[in-house]
Amino acid sequence: MDSSFNLAVHALVCLSHSGRSLSSEALAENICTNPTRVRRVMAGLKKAGMVETREGLDGGYRLTADPASLTLRQVAEAVNTRFVDCAWHSGDIDRDCVICSGMAGVLDALYRSMNEECAAYLSHITITDIETQLFEHK
């Protein structure tokens, strides 16, 4: 998993809490990253219809989705998050050994199941839930 999901949730909570448009610079300052990284992640959220951009003096990003119904699963999907992933596979499918030739397929199925479990869990948590948790523990 990369940091896109974390950044997206952070930005959406900021936008929800502020109730107004925020620039990529303002979001980056709160998230503690650079504006270019923010813009890259926000592009996925915009494409998914969660935010819109506005030009001008009070321009920036504005939350268009209802934070009370916007789930973390939807956010994860918008930024193409895979929670469990493995770029390297052990073994060799062309070998005669069952372990050597089958391990990658078995582990890939395990990773898919784990991602499905994560997505199911996140479908019950909204942006408002995260915002509420933050201010309950203040």
Region spans (language model):
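Non-DNA-binding regulatory cores of transcription-related proteins
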Residues: 64-138
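Key DNA-contact positions within bacterial/archaeal DNA-binding proteins
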Residues: 36
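Residue cluster at the C-terminal edge of the helix-turn-helix DNA-binding motif
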Residues: 47-50, 78
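N-terminal helix-turn-helix DNA-binding core of bacterial DNA-binding proteins
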Residues: 1-33
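Beta-hairpin "wing" of winged helix-turn-helix
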Residues: 49-64
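Core alpha-helical elements of the protein kinase catalytic domain
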Residues: 13, 43-44
